[in-house]
């Protein structure tokens, strides 16, 4: 009986944790979803961004106390501007979706919203992690050996 309880708790923690992509699996998925070269942004740059924003974790969240917004999902898309979480004051919801959609293992909605973000004048510079960890750096390592 104890073994079943422990197994249940382990399975529950896996469900809450979400999908953490393997590097090459994510690279192939992003390529398939049209991210390689989207708005002139290389697949390696998208991979670097995802690495430093979420560690490739679809369920990553980060609360920002200053403006009471939250960053969601593999790209850490912010509820102040891009999605609706029902609790961020003055939210814009420019991607026209619920923030919970950004936490799914299927990242199609997250990719569509990230594409919307980079259509704004700031482009990929909207992400602080990209500016701090990827901009003007050799990011080839994020796709190396993935065959993409």
Swiss-Prot record:
Name this protein carries in UniProt: Lysozyme C
Subunit architecture: Monomer.
Entry EC number(s): 3.2.1.17
Highest taxon in the source lineage: Eukaryota
Protein task: Lysozymes have primarily a bacteriolytic function; those in tissues and body fluids are associated with the monocyte-macrophage system and enhance the activity of immunoagents.
Catalytic activity: Hydrolysis of (1->4)-beta-linkages between N-acetylmuramic acid and N-acetyl-D-glucosamine residues in a peptidoglycan and between N-acetyl-D-glucosamine residues in chitodextrins
Active site (catalytic residues): 53, 71
Note: Lysozyme C is capable of both hydrolysis and transglycosylation; it also shows a slight esterase activity. It acts rapidly on both peptide-substituted and unsubstituted peptidoglycan, and slowly on chitin oligosaccharides.
Signal peptide extent: 1-18
Gene Ontology molecular function: any one: lysozyme activity
Cystine bridges: 24-146, 48-134, 83-99, 95-113
Key word Cell membrane present: no
Family statement drawn from the similarity comment of this UniProt entry: Belongs to the glycosyl hydrolase 22 family.
InterPro entries registered for this protein in UniProt: Glyco_hydro_22 (IPR001916), Glyco_hydro_22_CS (IPR019799), Glyco_hydro_22_lys (IPR000974), Lysozyme-like_dom_sf (IPR023346)
Name of the coding gene: LYZ
SUPFAM superfamilies listed in its UniProt record: Lysozyme-like
Ranges where the C-type lysozyme domain occurs: 19-148
An annotated GO BP: defense response to Gram-positive bacterium
Pfam families tied to this protein: Lys
SMART domains: LYZ1
UniProt keyword list: Antimicrobial, Bacteriolytic enzyme, Disulfide bond, Glycosidase, Hydrolase, Signal
């Amino acid at each position: 009986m104890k073994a079943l309880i422990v197994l249940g708790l382990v399975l529950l923690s896996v469900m809450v944790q979400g999908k953490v992509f393997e590097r090459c699996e994510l690279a192939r998925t992003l390529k398939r979803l049209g991210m390689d070269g989207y708005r002139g942004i290389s697949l390696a740059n998208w991979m670097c961004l995802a690495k430093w924003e979420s560690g490739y974790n679809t369920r990553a969240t980060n609360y920002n106390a200053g403006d009471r917004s939250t960053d969601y999902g593999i790209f850490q898309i912010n509820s102040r501007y891009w999605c609706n979480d029902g609790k961020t004051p003055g939210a814009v919801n420019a991607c026209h979706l619920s923030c919970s959609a950004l936490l799914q293992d299927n990242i199609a909605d997250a990719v569509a919203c990230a594409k919307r973000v980079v259509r704004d004048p700031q482009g990929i510079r909207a992400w602080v992690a990209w500016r701090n960890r990827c901009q003007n750096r050799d990011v080839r390592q994020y796709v190396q050996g993935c065959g993409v």
